[in-house]
């Protein structure tokens, strides 16, 4: 990509530290000939998309939650994002707050490199009419309301019936979201570069539905068969839709829907270790090779 000439900074709303840091970064960028605009909180999708259209980079100051909100509103625009971590986990917002200057210096010194990932695009249909459409960065979760009851769902893939499912819920996740709710439900970890998404049940009745990986171009349709129980769809853990019996949610991959600036540091495995998703238990195995006398070592 071309060198960065303009930056849009989006801060976590109601976070004075983020706003102060944004002002410091804005001054730093201006002194280097980069135009800068600061926005407190992502707000509505349309104004954010309009502001981001003129930016070579969107810098997000906050935690992974703030990154999710901004990335979801900018899904499909192709505008690269970079997160400065002011939160806890920092899997999406990967730049430590104390390293922002060195990081930006590196980004300005060479053409920007980006990593494109799959997002989810979904629609909710009621009575044959689409009542909602949206995108998801991490996942769409279909689950019960306040009462501890299983729900019944009908699942089709590419127009073909897959199964009826009785479970606490269902998680449809992108590779980016595989380290979120899905992994807690024993879904697989996925390389973010994969053109695929997962369908993972939450506590399936009798355990008769293993996690499923679908190609990014597949269409997964979920019909709510439950009556008399509250059912909701939650998008990235941040937005919710109340569902009724007979409603149908249709989901598919949005290729290149997410765009992140890359720093060329540690890879995916390093991030998994750093964030505690895998543990490296070093051990020394006994020598199993035959000794000079032709006998093997007993263990």
From Swiss-Prot:
SUPFAM superfamilies linked: NAD kinase/diacylglycerol kinase-like (SSF111331)
Active-site residues, record numbering mapped to chain: 64 (proton acceptor)
UniProt keywords, alphabetically: ATP-binding, Cytoplasm, Kinase, NAD, NADP, Nucleotide-binding, Transferase
Recorded catalytic activity of this chain's protein: NAD(+) + ATP = ADP + NADP(+) + H(+)
Alphabetized GO MF terms: ATP binding; metal ion binding; NAD binding; NAD+ kinase activity
Pfam families: NAD_kinase, NAD_kinase_C
This protein's record includes keyword ATP-binding: yes
Keyword S-adenosyl-L-methionine on entry: no
EC annotation from Swiss-Prot or TrEMBL: 2.7.1.23
List of residues binding NAD(+): 64-65, 138-139, 149, 166, 168, 179-184, 238
Cofactor: a divalent metal cation
GO biological process: NAD metabolic process; NADP biosynthetic process
Role played: Involved in the regulation of the intracellular balance of NAD and NADP, and is a key enzyme in the biosynthesis of NADP. Catalyzes specifically the phosphorylation on 2'-hydroxyl of the adenosine moiety of NAD to yield NADP.
Similarity field: Belongs to the NAD kinase family.
Protein's name according to its UniProt entry: NAD kinase
């Amino acid at each position: 990509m071309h060198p960065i000439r303009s930056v849009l900074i989006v801060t976590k709303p109601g976070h004075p530290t983020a706003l102060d840091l944004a002002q410091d970064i804005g001054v730093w960028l201006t002194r280097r000939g980069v135009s800068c605009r600061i926005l407190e909180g992502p707000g509505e999708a349309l104004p954010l998309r309009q502001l981001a259209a003129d930016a070579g980079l969107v810098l997000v100051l906050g935690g992974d939650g703030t990154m999710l909100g901004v990335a979801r509103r900018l899904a499909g625009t192709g505008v690269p994002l970079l997160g400065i971590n002011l939160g806890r986990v920092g899997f999406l917002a990967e730049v430590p707050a104390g390293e922002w200057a060195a990081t930006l210096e590196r980004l300005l010194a060479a053409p920007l490199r980006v990593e494109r990932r799959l997002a989810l695009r979904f629609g909710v249909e009621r009575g044959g009419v689409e009542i909602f459409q949206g995108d998801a960065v991490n996942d769409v979760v279909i689950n019960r309301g306040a009462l501890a009851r299983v729900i019944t769902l009908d699942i089709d893939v590419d127009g073909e019936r897959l199964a009826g499912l009785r479970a606490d819920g269902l998680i449809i996740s992108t590779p980016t979201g595989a380290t979120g709710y899905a992994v807690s439900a024993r879904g697989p970890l996925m390389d973010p570069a994969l053109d695929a998404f997962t369908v993972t049940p939450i506590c399936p009745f009798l355990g008769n539905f293993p996690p499923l990986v679908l190609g990014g171009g597949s269409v997964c349709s979920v019909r709510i068969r439950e009556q008399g129980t509250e059912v909701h769809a939650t998008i990235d853990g941040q937005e919710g839709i109340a569902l009724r019996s007979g409603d149908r949610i249709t989901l598919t991959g949005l290729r290149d829907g997410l765009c992140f600036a890359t720093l060329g540091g540690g890879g995916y495995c390093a991030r998994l270790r750093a964030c505690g998703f895998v543990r490296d238990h070093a051990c020394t195995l006994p020598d199993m090779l035959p000794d000079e006398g032709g006998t093997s070592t007993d263990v």
